[in-house]
Amino acid sequence: MADKLVKATAKNGDVRIIAAITTDMVNEGVKTHKCAPTAAAALGRMLTAGVLMGAQLKAESDSITLKINGGGIAKSVTVTSYSDAHVKGYIANPNADLPVNSQGKLDVGGIIGKNGNLLVIRDMGLKEPYVGQVPIYTGEIGDDIAYYYVNSEQTPSAVGLGVLVDKDLSIKASGGFIIQMMPGADDLVADLITYRLQEIPSITDLIAKGMSVEDILEFIFEDMDLKILDEGIVPEYRCDCSRDRVEKALISIGMKDLKEIYDDGKQEEVVCNFCNKKYVFTNDEVGSLIKRLENNK
């Protein structure tokens, strides 16, 4: 089933929903970083969480960055997403892998670890970005996002994230949802949704069966006044790096470090963490950056 993100409500607007199929998007990210199976599941869940949370942003230029580091062998996983559903991300150790857990599933919590924090940075073009941080709850990512919403934004939320990795390391199915109760919503509605989520198959099973994102929501919210609010948008893995941005990043390291690079007499290679694109600066070009920095004093 094709990738798609939709927004919806249920129970006369008491329930807010964002849901997406992200199979192709996650496949692109995992392929870019050549991930081992468990690393692929971890990165895929984070990319899906990012694109779902990014859909809540208002302005086109707004962005949200998620970073999780629990002291496990994955080290850290970072994603940045935008309101138009494009996302980029990387896992510091793409080779992180463990045997399946006791439920027979990829041990994402095991490679993430629990000794650390989930960081959420919202950049809305203000002087300072909004930064929220919570301790890692389970390391399974979906639980940690839900824990963040309750503790940092006081919004009770159910977060489901799933990535099914095939034998050839491609992504067979990926998707997720964020379900949030609005202020004043009946507690019985929350109980009903919790019960249904416990009873239904995983989101990856539903996607693998060929269900669309609308089909999945109709299945979960049957007889609950589900309203799909838009035609949906296509999530996309896309890096927006450029030589100009890399130049600015090099300049930002400061005169002292730039002069050390220049005095070495070698070219400088910078690799983008998000897409692995290489940017090469000759020694003369590094010298030009130093001159530009001197002229801006």
Curated annotation (Swiss-Prot):
What are the BP-aspect GO terms? protein refolding
Q: Which family does it belong to?
A: Belongs to the HSP33 family.
Q: How does it get modified post-translation?
A: Under oxidizing conditions two disulfide bonds are formed involving the reactive cysteines. Under reducing conditions zinc is bound to the reactive cysteines and the protein is inactive.
Q: Where in the cell is it found?
A: Cytoplasm
Listed GO MF terms:
protein folding chaperone; unfolded protein binding
Q: Which domain of life is it from?
A: Bacteria
GO CC term (a single one)? cytoplasm
**Cystine residue pairs:** C239-C241, C272-C275
User: Which controlled-vocabulary keywords does the entry list?
Assistant: Chaperone, Cytoplasm, Disulfide bond, Redox-active center, Zinc
**Which InterPro entries has this protein been placed in?**
Heat_shock_Hsp33, Heat_shock_Hsp33_C, Heat_shock_Hsp33_N
Organism in which the protein naturally occurs: Clostridium acetobutylicum (strain ATCC 824 / DSM 792 / JCM 1419 / IAM 19013 / LMG 5710 / NBRC 13948 / NRRL B-527 / VKM B-1787 / 2291 / W)
Q: Which PANTHER family match?
A: 33 KDA CHAPERONIN (PTHR30111:SF1)
**Name of this chain's protein:** 33 kDa chaperonin
Q: What is the stated purpose of this protein? A: Redox regulated molecular chaperone. Protects both thermally unfolding and oxidatively damaged proteins from irreversible aggregation. Plays an important role in the bacterial defense system toward oxidative stress.
